């Protein structure tokens, strides 16, 4: 059985949507990868920039297990466990 696969570049152009609220969360900015297990741990989305043009936004981290479905042009996630990274 062939599993569907997507390139990182293709995934970065897919809209990420919370299935609970229907909210568009944005596009993938980065991936967090476990280099020992060769697995994706989470996806990182750019957060909203509060405070003006030059302010740093808080990134949103979504655990890979919270991804419900990867389609042709959209990624559906369970947004109950969103983590906002305030680095």
Swiss-Prot record:
InterPro entries registered for this protein in UniProt: PRC-brl_dom, PRC_barrel-like_sf, Spore_YlmC/YmxH
Pfam families: PRC
Domain of life: Bacteria
S-S bridge residues: none
Residue intervals passing through the bilayer: none
UniProt family annotation: Belongs to the YlmC/YmxH family.
Record's protein name: Uncharacterized protein CA_C1697
Origin species: Clostridium acetobutylicum (strain ATCC 824 / DSM 792 / JCM 1419 / IAM 19013 / LMG 5710 / NBRC 13948 / NRRL B-527 / VKM B-1787 / 2291 / W)
């Amino acid at each position: 059985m062939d599993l569907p696969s997507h390139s990182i570049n293709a995934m970065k152009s897919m809209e990420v949507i919370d299935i609970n609220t229907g909210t568009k969360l944005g596009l993938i900015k980065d991936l967090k990868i476990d280099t020992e297990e060769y697995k994706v741990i989470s996806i990182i989305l750019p957060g909203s920039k509060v405070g003006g043009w030059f302010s740093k936004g808080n990134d949103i981290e979504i655990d890979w297990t919270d991804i419900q479905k990867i389609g042709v042009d959209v990624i559906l996630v369970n947004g109950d466990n969103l983590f906002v990274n305030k680095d």
